[in-house]
């Protein structure tokens, strides 16, 4: 019945799961079945090697891998008919009596400074096969939007919020960057956010600060469902965001992006299309200008056509790139 993977976490974490799902598909030669919050199902539809777990493959898999130790995942694992149930945790202290009763194997692997995507990749399976590559998603189809939402001309998408208020950056800094983008020729600017009260307030403050600099933006906060947001982000000329799901999605969809980090450390990886800076960085405007120039010359967008069968059977990022 194939392999079942269970993860009940936020949207960004589900995106970061893509490389290890790709690896499992390569190792087993079959599509992986993922049990996650149902609202993230559109993300799964953009992973050709994975499908949302339903039917017998949900309840009677050949093997089960739980990639988080939360109660929802543990309950789902307990009611799955499968002898081989493996739990991955970052440290032994996370293991409880319930975990020992439910799982046949518990692997405690310290992240060691690795991000979630790389930690999962290194902790699951063997070192043979494809090498690690960051998350990759297919381009959302055209029917994932509605009339009047996605501009026809090149536009900037600003997503300045996430689930944590501590990651929010100064509206004045966003306004200054949007002024730079406007001067570069990107006159159409959209700002998006969720439906929390502070999301609306924060986006409104950014719009006000931007207006003072002579730039008008369109606020679509709380006005998109997930498929529409994915479509909108994938068609943007440039994405500006905080560290969170939007940043991971921009990377996975290969949309040029600038991510500001208000808390935590800035990733050391250097990628000319996906730049990370500490909030308040004095060179942000210069970096944005360079990002615009580089991304305009390196045209490496995902294919919009159907993927070959070889990519759907043990897909790897390198194979996907070669098929473009």
Q: Predicted segment positions?
A:
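Catalytic machinery of carbohydrate-active enzymes
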Residues: 1-324
């Amino acid at each position: 019945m194939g392999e079942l993977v269970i993860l009940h976490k936020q949207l960004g974490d589900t995106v970061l799961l893509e490389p290890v799902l790709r690896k499992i598909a390569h190792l087993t030669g079959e599509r992986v079945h993922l049990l996650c919050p149902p609202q993230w199902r559109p993300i799964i539809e953009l992973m050709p090697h994975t499908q949302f777990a339903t039917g017998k493959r949900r309840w009677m898999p050949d093997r089960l891998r739980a990639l988080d130790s939360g109660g929802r995942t543990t309950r789902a694992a307990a009611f799955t008919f499968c002898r081989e149930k493996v739990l991955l945790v970052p440290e032994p202290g996370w293991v409880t009596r319930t975990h020992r009763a439910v799982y046949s194997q518990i692997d405690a692997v310290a992240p060691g400074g690795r991000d979630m995507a790389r930690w999962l990749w290194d902790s699951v399976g063997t070192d043979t096969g494809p090498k690690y590559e960051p998350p990759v998603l297919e381009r959302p189809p055209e029917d994932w939007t509605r009339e009047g939402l996605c501009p026809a001309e090149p536009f900037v998408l600003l997503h300045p919020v996430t689930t944590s208020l501590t990651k929010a950056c100064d509206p004045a800094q966003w306004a200054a960057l949007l002024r730079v983008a406007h001067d570069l020729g990107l006159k159409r600017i959209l700002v998006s956010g969720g439906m929390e009260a502070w999301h609306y307030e924060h986006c409104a403050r950014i719009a006000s600060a931007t207006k003072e600099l002579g730039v008008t933006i369109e606020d679509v906060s709380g006005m998109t469902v997930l498929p529409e947001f994915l479509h909108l982000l994938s068609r943007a000329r440039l994405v500006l965001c905080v560290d969170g799901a939007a940043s991971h999605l921009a990377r996975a969809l290969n949309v040029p992006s600038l991510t500001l980090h208000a808390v935590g450390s800035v990733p050391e990886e250097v990628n000319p299309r996906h730049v990370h800076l500490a909030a308040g960085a004095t060179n942000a405007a210069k970096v944005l200008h360079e990002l615009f120039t580089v991304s305009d010359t390196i045209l490496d967008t995902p294919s919009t056509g159907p993927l070959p069968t070889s990519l759907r059977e043990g897909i790897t990022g390198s194979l996907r790139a070669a098929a473009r």
